[in-house]
Structure formats: C-alpha cells, structure tokens
Swiss-Prot record:
Protein species of origin: Xenopus laevis (African clawed frog)
PROSITE patterns for this protein: STATHMIN_1 (PS00563), STATHMIN_2 (PS01041), STATHMIN_3 (PS51663)
Region of interest (Disordered), ranges: 165-185
InterPro entries from the UniProt entry: Stathmin_CS, Stathmin_fam, Stathmin_sf
Domain SLD residue range list: 48-185
UniProt biased composition (Basic and acidic residues): 166-185
GO BP field: microtubule depolymerization; neuron projection development; regulation of microtubule polymerization or depolymerization
Coiled-coil residues: 90-185
GO cellular component terms, A-Z: cytoplasm; neuron projection
Listed name of the protein: Stathmin-4
This protein's UniProt keywords: Coiled coil
Length: 185
C-alpha cells in the first residue's frame, strides 16, 4: 500500500469509525463497552496504525490528538500493476473492422438518401396539393362569376323587356287618347 493510498483510506473513514468502531485482533478477548455519560473509554478501541492521546479534560468535553502511524510494508509482497500487453491485430481483424466500418457508412448513406427522398416526396405532395387547391379555387371562382353574369344578363333582359312593354303600353294609351281626341272633335 502506498502512502497516497493510505491517506485516501484514512480520509474515507468517518470520525466515529476511527474512534469507536475498531476491531481487536482476537474477537474472543474483545472488551464490552460500557457507556457512561460524558465519558469516552479509549481502551475499548484497539487501533494498530494510529494513536489517540487525551490532551486535557474540561467540563465542556474532551480534546484529543490523533497521531497516524506510517504504514508498515513488512511482509507485504510488492504488487506491480501490469496491464496485459496488447497484441497486434491481425490482417483479418483489421479487414473485418474496415468492412464493418464500410457497412456502417453505407447504411448511414442509405438512411440519409431514404430520408432525403421522403422529404422530397413530401414537398412534392405539398406542392401538388397546393396546385390542386389553387385550381379548384380558380374553377369555383370562374363558375360563380359565370353564374352571376348569367343572372345579371337575365335580370337585364327582363328589365329591358319590362321597360319595352311599358313603353308600348304608353304608346298604345297615347294612340287611344289621340283617337278619342280626334273622334270628339
């Protein structure tokens, strides 16, 4: 264990664990802790790599000094972390990877072409629909205009016929009045 790893290990331990959750080497001889108000029994913990010294006792509490002992590397075999050596890839593996990459590239291109074709088809459908709606609108407008012109023509002809008929009646009436006037003379 390196010194840096040891420091990290100590940082990870909670303070309560450092003071009170220590294990004796022999669990059969483990002392039982008796809780008394406002006291801490330092003999209950057996910590092999740290030393706790009581500095002074006050009415407000205790103060301690915790001295961490350096780790001893006696009897611990040296562990060297070696990564397994990477072997050189064979020509077949390289070829397989290249083929797989080519397949992925072709698949992506096909998907892109498919997406673009769908987009163009949608745009074409939208344009055709707009043209069809425009043609329908033009056709309906022409039909309405033709119908209104026909109605106007019929109304005009009927109005002219009515005016002509009234004029003829006036002429008849005037002719009768002239005849009556001449007959009375």
């Amino acid at each position: 264990m390196t010194l840096a790893a040891y420091k990290e290990k100590v940082k990870e331990l909670p303070l309560v664990s450092i003071f009170c959750s220590c294990f004796l080497s022999d669990p059969l001889k483990k002392q039982t802790y008796k809780y008394e108000a406002d006291t801490v029994d330092l003999t209950w913990c057996a910590i092999s790599d740290m030393e706790v010294i009581e500095l002074n006792k006050r009415a407000s509490g205790h103060s301690f000094e915790v001295i961490l002992k350096p780790p001893s590397f006696d009897g611990i075999p040296e562990i060297t972390a070696t990564l397994p050596q990477k072997r050189d890839p064979s020509l077949e593996e390289i070829q397989k990877k290249l083929e797989a990459a080519e397949e992925r590239r072709k698949y992506r291109e096909a998907e892109l072409r498919k997406h673009q074709a769908e987009k163009r088809e949608h745009e074409r459908e939208v344009i055709l629909k707009a043209i069809e709606e425009n043609n329908n609108f033009s056709k309906m407008a022409k039909e309405k205009l033709a119908q209104r012109m026909e109605v106007n023509k019929e109304n005009r002809e009927a109005h002219l016929a009515a005016m002509l008929e009234r004029l003829q009646e006036k002429d008849k009436h005037a002719e009768e009045v002239r005849k009556n006037k001449e007959a009375t003379r």
